[in-house]
């Protein structure tokens, strides 16, 4: 369908699928409150695929193209940034963790400019231990709350991180269910 592009922060999709996934399960989602949405669920529940599908839908919408959804209301973003599957670099002496820290720093520098952005962070700090990942994720989330002109879509396996913000009005949540058949 052709999305409805709006000059506000309203953002919702109905029936989004990733076009490269055969027999994809459609998902409906909306930014129900705040500027941060935390996606939770078990391994292989579809968090990363859903984030990729949403990001692709937003990108296609901004190109003026049809989107693989039933319906979509999308803000007019001035930038789309992702942190998904970042590579390490032996040549540059950069670990996966360092690559992620540098990417988050880069995204924060874009957000500080005041431009309306969509930022997608897939499992922040997944390449470090659970305690450090939790603490770093909470610290980043606290900073992101201050950028109300941006939307942040964040997936996580760290339930304690999600619980730390469950009553925070800047965050909404999307739980991805999985069924073993």
Question: What are the residue ranges of the model-derived segments?
Answer:
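ATPase nucleotide-binding head domains, primarily ABC-like/P-loop NTPase cores
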Residues: 3-181
